[in-house]
Structure formats: structure tokens, C-alpha cells
């Protein structure tokens, strides 16, 4: 039994959920999201709640996945998502100019990123980055791409890390 799939989603008053063929559209105060919704999972909308059901036992995993995806879409169009990254290292800097993010993270050249559609990038300080958007998947993917430029290393902890990430540190070699 999919426990996540059986949970009911509360739909806020300012949000509308519509199904058009195999696509589902969620509109809210922050914007609009559309994505493919598997036809093997059905949902019923009544009294500001959404109930999910599946056609067969083979679709258990899909049941919970589609419910979680729709819940994150609803949360995205109402509140949005924010990922915060921190740069740790001497001379590591980030500068956001419009849709471009420029990183100086120890390479001989600056690394430039173009923010995807629907994502805004801010740099409150030279060593912190804030990524905001309505799509949890797009915000998380963009944050992961930035982190992959210079992931935190375990000896000194230098690199780009998520704000709440714990970097497990290792001891260096012991001398004779």
C-alpha cells in the first residue's frame, strides 16, 4: 500500500488544478506549472481536497510519486522554493547580474551560469547564493549544477555547499 499516495492534498483557495489530457496544470499567485501526469493514476477534486487512486497494484510506487509531484507543484505556486549555497575558500566569490551567475572558485577562469526560465539568482554576499523559483525540480537541479563546479572537499572543507549541508572532515596524513 502506498502510504504517501493515500494522503489527501489540501488545495489553497488561490490555487486551481486542472487536467488536460495527460498534462496537469497548477495555477497560483506565484505562477503556473504544467507537467505530464501518468494516466494510470487518477485523482478526484472535491471540497478543496484532492484524492488519488490507482488502477492496479503494480502502480504502487507511481501512486506516491505522482501525489508528491502534485503536492510540490501546489507548494511551489503558493510559496515557491529557495535553495541557498555557501562558498567556502580563500578568494571564492559569486556575482549575480540579472540571469547570469559568475563564480570565481579557484580555476584560472570564471565559471558563468545562465539561470533557467522561471529561476532567479541573488547573491546577498560574495560568498552566498540564493536560488528561487516555483519548480522544486528546476531549482534543485540548478543548485546541484552550481555545486558540482567545486563540491566541498573533505580535508579543508573548501568548495560550494548547500547552506544546511554537513561536510564530513577527514584527518590528513600523519607524519613520521
Curated annotation (Swiss-Prot):
The keyword RNA-binding applies. One of its GO terms (molecular function) is rRNA binding. Keywords: Ribonucleoprotein, Ribosomal protein, RNA-binding, rRNA-binding. GO terms for biological process: cytoplasmic translation. It comes from the Bacteria. PROSITE patterns: RIBOSOMAL_L6_1 (PS00525). Belongs to the universal ribosomal protein uL6 family. Part of the 50S ribosomal subunit. PANTHER family: 60S/50S RIBOSOMAL PROTEIN L6/L9, LARGE RIBOSOMAL SUBUNIT PROTEIN UL6M. This is Large ribosomal subunit protein uL6.
Amino acid at each position: 500500500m502506498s502510504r504517501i499516495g493515500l494522503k489527501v492534498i489540501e488545495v489553497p483557495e488561490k490555487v486551481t488544478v486542472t487536467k488536460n489530457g495527460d498534462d496537469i496544470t497548477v495555477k497560483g499567485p506565484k505562477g503556473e506549472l504544467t507537467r505530464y501526469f501518468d494516466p494510470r493514476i487518477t485523482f478526484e477534486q472535491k471540497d478543496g481536497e484532492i484524492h488519488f487512486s490507482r488502477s492496479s497494484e503494480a502502480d504502487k510506487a507511481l501512486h506516491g510519486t505522482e501525489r508528491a509531484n502534485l503536492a510540490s507543484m501546489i507548494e511551489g505556486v503558493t510559496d515557491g522554493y529557495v535553495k541557498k549555497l555557501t562558498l567556502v575558500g580563500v578568494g571564492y566569490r559569486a556575482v549575480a547580474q540579472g540571469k547570469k551567475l559568475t563564480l570565481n572558485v579557484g580555476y584560472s577562469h570564471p565559471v558563468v551560469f545562465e539561470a533557467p526560465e522561471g529561476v532567479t539568482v541573488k547573491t546577498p554576499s560574495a560568498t552566498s547564493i540564493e536560488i528561487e523559483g516555483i519548480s522544486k525540480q528546476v531549482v534543485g537541479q540548478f543548485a546541484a549544477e552550481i555545486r558540482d563546479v567545486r563540491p566541498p572537499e573533505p580535508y579543508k572543507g573548501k568548495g560550494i555547499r548547500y547552506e544546511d549541508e554537513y561536510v564530513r572532515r577527514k584527518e590528513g596524513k600523519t607524519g613520521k
